[in-house]
Amino acid sequence: MSRRVKKLNQLFRADISALLQKEVRDPRLDTLLSVNEVDVSEDMRHATVYVSHLAGDEHKDEILAALNAAAGFFRTEIAKKTDIRYMPVFNFIWDDTIERGVRLNTLIDRVTQHQPED
């Protein structure tokens, strides 16, 4: 991954987070929504935005629908502040790494509790 793409990943993550906090008025997108990572393609035409919600994935489909419906808004607002040749198309994906990590830790705890100590 080039240094430029890494910088754009950081920039887009910060900008989308700020827009979610200050500009977006959709009630499905509350302050518990977290932008975990942005992955811009090497040609800078597409960006995958990984999001999660602190309350879990209960309303995952509604949240993703709202975010993908607002993708053009994010693209337009960020383009106003950014001087890059191509503004990528944003695609929002649910990031379940936190939930998987919690499940993995739970399984590890169960296994270690059932093993006899040496």
Curated annotation (Swiss-Prot):
Organism taxonomic ancestry: Bacteria, Bacillati, Chloroflexota, Dehalococcoidia, Dehalococcoidales
UniProt xrefs under InterPro entries: KH_dom-like_a/b, RbfA, RbfA_dom_sf, Ribosome-bd_factorA_CS
Subunit architecture: Monomer. Binds 30S ribosomal subunits, but not 50S ribosomal subunits or 70S ribosomes.
UniProt GO molecular function: ribosomal small subunit binding
Tree of life domain: Bacteria
Main location, first listed in the record: cytoplasm
Coiled coil region boundaries: none
Keywords associated with the record: Cytoplasm, Ribosome biogenesis
Family label: Belongs to the RbfA family.
GO BP terms: maturation of SSU-rRNA
Keyword Cytoplasm: yes
Name of this chain's protein: Ribosome-binding factor A
Function according to Swiss-Prot or TrEMBL: One of several proteins that assist in the late maturation steps of the functional core of the 30S ribosomal subunit. Associates with free 30S ribosomal subunits (but not with 30S subunits that are part of 70S ribosomes or polysomes). Required for efficient processing of 16S rRNA. May interact with the 5'-terminal helix region of 16S rRNA.
Locations listed in the record: Cytoplasm
UniProt entry tagged with the keyword Transcription: no
Gene3D superfamilies, A to Z: 3.30.300.20
GO CC list: cytosol
